[in-house]
A protein has these predicted regions:
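Charged, low-complexity interaction tracts
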Residues: 39-182
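Charge-rich, low-complexity N-terminal segments
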Residues: 1-52
Length: 182
């Protein structure tokens, strides 16, 4: 019975472990109620390469545990926050106009849109000047950090066991100078 550890064996272990890691990270992300649009969750992908594997996620993936620090924001940040408010289903009180519509003036936005833009602007300003609430509170370490460590340990154990079995097999098949098994 020929027993040889192949690259395919190692790739299978790696693929299985990375897929399990992906699932656990998504479950932690959902349990922490961080999902709004689902784009970050949907962006987490496993890619196996010739020499290893990669777990990919969109750019803000790292902020799931750290939050976003204050500072420069992307173009149209208020619009991004506006969409986040909508995706999260946050209720926003409308802001009524004081001025009455007339022939010379028609409101550009509905009261509901005004309330949404006002809230999005306030949130965007707070993040730009102070960072997200998660960042201000020191972050967390339960979304992906412990899961990555578990996965690395599991891969190490499983691949190590494969090679340990291979070495035992080699030892069993070695012969001494007389041609007899040792």
């Amino acid at each position: 019975m020929e027993m040889t550890v192949t690259r395919a064996d190692v790739q299978k272990i790696l693929g299985d472990e990375l897929e399990a890691l992906r699932s656990r990270i998504i479950a932690n992300h959902v349990a922490a109620k961080q999902v709004a649009s689902g784009r970050t969750k949907d962006s987490i992908k496993v890619e196996l390469t010739e020499n290893g594997g990669i777990l990919w996620g969109r750019f803000p993936f790292g902020t799931l545990e750290t939050g976003r620090r204050a500072g420069r924001t992307p173009h149209n940040f208020t619009g991004i926050i506006r969409q986040w408010v909508i995706d999260k289903g946050i209720s926003v009180p409308p802001i009524q106009y004081i001025r009455e519509p007339s022939e010379r003036w028609k409101p550009k936005y509905t009261p509901k849109e005004r309330g949404l833009m006002s809230m999005a602007g306030a949130i965007a300003h707070k993040i730009k000047t102070e960072g997200t609430k998660l960042y201000r509170e020191g972050g967390r370490n339960d979304i992906y950090s412990p899961e990555v460590e578990k996965t690395v340990n599991s891969i190490t154990d499983r691949v190590g066991l494969l090679f340990e079995q291979e070495v035992e097999h080699i030892n069993l098949n070695t012969k001494n100078e007389d041609g007899h098994n040792k």
